[in-house]
């Protein structure tokens, strides 16, 4: 049995809590927690603490995070991600220089309004659930820190840039 950490890949379409429940059934442990929440439509590594290791979760939650993400230029959706309905579009696509140089403007302490389709809880309910029900959710800006932000690739033909960031909790 024991006390340990597991790094699980969380695919798109499943909540962090559901992944924890699946792992509980597989390994037969009831004391499992996750270090942070990935939105349902996000994919990536979700650290799971088992047994007494759950006492260390807060240390990992407060640690710096790294993400790789893509941005599609020229399209705005109602959800802020690829799953939403397109609500606006523009023909303007930034230049390669603009895509790469904009990064420095975001380094440091900034205020971020989380997207309405996020896993943040509003009165005990995930914001994305309220948004899918058509309820208007106003999320308050949060202080976050971006330690590093780099453009890794820019596909001008498809208007997609891929970025790397190192940040405090609560960024994406």
Curated annotation (Swiss-Prot):
Q: Where is the active site?
A: 39 (nucleophile)
Q: What is this protein called?
A: Putative tRNA pseudouridine synthase B
This enzyme catalyses: uridine(55) in tRNA = pseudouridine(55) in tRNA
Has the keyword tRNA processing been applied to this entry?
yes
| Biological process (GO), any one | tRNA modification
Q: What's a single GO MF annotation on this record? A: tRNA pseudouridine(55) synthase activity
Summarize the protein's role.
Responsible for synthesis of pseudouridine from uracil-55 in the psi GC loop of transfer RNAs.
Q: What gene does the UniProt entry assign to this protein? A: truB
Give the UniProt keywords, A-Z.
Answer: Isomerase, tRNA processing
